[in-house]
Amino acid sequence: TSAGVEWATNNNHNRAKALSDLTGANLAPTVGLFTLVSQVDKHAIILGVDPINTAGTARTGQIDPMLIAFSDQDNIVEWEPKSTNTAGALSLSEGSTIVGAVKSRQEILVWTDTSLYSMQFIGPPFTFGINLINKETGLIGPNAAIVTSKGVFWMAVDNFYVYTGTVQKVPCTVLSYVFDDINVSEVY
């Protein structure tokens, strides 16, 4: 998988260009699982990203499935965390891989295979805060969550859930029909 891209328009041809190939790119991720933009505070965010090496000179090229990296505010080419910018990274602890994320009202909800996290912009010096919302309610696949006016709904490996500030199981008359015939070894 590739990391984030920018769409370049040239002679009526649209093409994607890797962030790491952009002029001035500094430690931009080279691989990642998911990319999104936190539009209110204007940060590019890549989930399941390759970390910066121990020397701090390059990306490793190997996905850390529990690492989230974010660019400097309103600057998609600057990914090196410095005291003079808002770039940085967060590591999740519950689960083995990030499965998906959605932008909600005041937060970005991030699911691992086992848990749900809330990621919120808090400003410098930490930029984003991450809070574990619930264990044992992971996401079954990258497209198994949706934001609605009634809350955020998703499918886990054992149930349907809704988040409205707290996590609740969704009453469902077809629950056994769906989950009694699912091969959990083939989930994301």
Residue ranges and their predicted role:
Residues 1, 51, 92-188:
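Beta-sheet-dominated scaffold domains
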Residues 17-26, 83-92, 129-135:
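A short beta-strand motif characteristic of beta-propeller blades
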Residues 5-19, 75-84, 124-130, 168-171:
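Beta-strand initiation motifs
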Residues 9, 29-30, 71, 171-175:
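Alpha-helix initiation/capping motif
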Residues 16-19, 24, 60-67, 71-73, ...:
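Generic N-terminal initiation segments characterized by hydrophobic and/or small/turn-forming residues
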Residues 44-46, 75-86, 90-91, 110-111, ...:
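A structural signal for short, well-ordered beta-strand segments and their strand-loop junctions
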Residues 1-42, 50:
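Disordered, low-complexity "stalk" and linker segments at domain junctions of extracellular
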Residues 32-80:
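Carboxylate/His-rich catalytic cores and anion/metal-binding grooves
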